[in-house]
């Protein structure tokens, strides 16, 4: 199976996520919205509605790919492998992540701030209408660093150690967190369960990834010592138990400071500051972050394979 996952990564790097083709994540989102409406209308509490919605989405997201691969394997093992490759391909997003941040970079190179704000709004939830160039760069770097775990290394973790059905299960977990994991009036209770499950699912991959980011910064000639230092000093300051780790590692590697004031629907939100502002924000830091993300994705996958192979050998 490792070679199959490697092919999935290659397909993602070549094709990305074609917008005109059906995608499991969009189907998961539609299912989740329908179940949310049903259980909100038929449950005694928002917490129970959120738990039932989440568990049913998780179950369906696991069973469909699991049974599909089993059926394909019965027809021919090659069909099973091909289907597994395609399922895993849909759970990772290396190409899309790099492309989106590159679009922000291109707009900034053209000194087109309105376009850069529009492009960065596709990858962040904060208000972008009045962001300065430095704030756009910070938003782009923060989003890319955070999504390295959600969009790449965690689905690869479950693909390597569990297979395609587990990778899709994780994708459903992350999708529900994106839909419901907000601490506002509507989702504070309903979304608490999927948010906790997402934190749990990302816990180990986030920690592995953050240290591999330090290693990647060494190979790329960035400040790896500072990356390790900031990771250990600031990684746990973030409200999320996982997001701050990779953001801190990237901040240290690039010698910049992430976090600070953001606006969400006009409401000010202050995130802990990660890193020290040794350098001003520069457009090239977007490309440097992309290099870190790409190399870290490859090295993390190799690390997973080594652990999997070692465990298989001894067991």
Curated annotation (Swiss-Prot):
Entry's localization field: Cell membrane
Entries under InterPro entries matching the protein: Cobalamin_biosynth_CobD/CbiB
Annotated pathway: Cofactor biosynthesis; adenosylcobalamin biosynthesis
Keywords per UniProt: Cell membrane, Cobalamin biosynthesis, Membrane, Transmembrane, Transmembrane helix
GO cellular component terms attached to this protein's record: plasma membrane
Topology of this chain in the membrane: Multi-pass membrane protein
GO molecular function list: ABC-type vitamin B12 transporter activity; threonine-phosphate decarboxylase activity
Pfam families assigned to the protein according to its UniProt record, in alphabetical order: CobD_Cbib
Its biological purpose: Converts cobyric acid to cobinamide by the addition of aminopropanol on the F carboxylic group.
Protein name in the entry: Cobalamin biosynthesis protein CobD
Organism encoding this protein: Leptospira interrogans serogroup Icterohaemorrhagiae serovar Lai (strain 56601)
Top-level taxonomy: Bacteria, Pseudomonadati, Spirochaetota, Spirochaetia, Leptospirales
